[in-house]
A protein has these predicted regions:
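Acidic, metal-coordinating catalytic segment for phosphate/diphosphate chemistry
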Residues: 1-27, 105-106
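Hydrophobic (often cysteine-bearing) scaffold residues that line and stabilize catalytic clefts
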Residues: 15, 64, 160, 164
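Short glycine/proline- and charge-enriched loop/turn segments
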Residues: 39, 44-52
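Unchanged
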Residues: 57-158
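Charged phosphate-binding loop/patch that engages nucleotide di/tri-phosphates or the phosphate backbone
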Residues: 149-181
């Protein structure tokens, strides 16, 4: 049986539409979560336990902003937020050749992401990545922390670095804005 070449797969497979969240605290740092490993070997291989911002798929008929709010809550329990900005463009990333046809359930060539920046207005006790939504949602992270925005590309899995660099560029002015109200 002959398998499709990576080039053929890229031509055939679409991008998955996703929403991403850069959640800033009043000190201008961004919330990142460490990908939980072990539940799914494919996911473990795909992500390699890096840190990343909350993100997830946009459901059919769902607005990207609504998806961003939903994904943030489903992954962190956070709902105390104010919208600060929306990235001006969709951000794309492609899966590496060796993951095409298997990662993202084999249905996508990568992701097309719409990014939103929010200010966290709650108390840190609201953040719960281990039992998000009071345990209603599967934990995608096993830890979280606040991090400098410009450091994010070095903390993410290699094939998403350019996408994260685009997000950092889009939101570069926000840390200063939120620090000074």
């Amino acid at each position: 049986m002959q398998t499709e070449s990576p080039e053929a797969l890229r031509q055939r497979l679409p991008y998955r539409d996703c929403a991403g969240v850069a959640l800033f605290n009043r000190q201008g740092k961004v919330l990142i979560g460490r990908r939980r490993m072990g539940d799914d070997p494919e996911e473990s291989a795909l992500h390699g336990a890096p840190w990343q911002m909350p993100q997830g798929g946009i459901d059919k008929g769902e607005a990207p902003l609504d998806a961003a709010r939903r994904e943030l809550f489903e992954e962190t329990s956070v709902s105390s937020i104010e919208l600060v900005a929306e990235a001006p463009d969709w951000v794309l990333y492609d899966l590496p050749d060796d993951m095409l046809g298997s990662a993202l359930k084999g249905k996508y060539r990568g992701q097309r992401q719409r990014w939103f920046a929010f200010l966290f207005t709650g108390d840190e006790r609201e953040i719960d990545v281990l039992a998000p939504g009071g345990g209603k949602f599967h934990a995608e992270f096993d830890d979280w922390r606040w991090e400098e925005l410009e450091r994010l590309p070095e903390l993410i899995v290699a094939f998403k670095r350019d996408a994260y660099a685009a997000v950092v560029a889009a939101f570069a002015d926000i840390p200063e804005r939120v620090r000074h109200g």
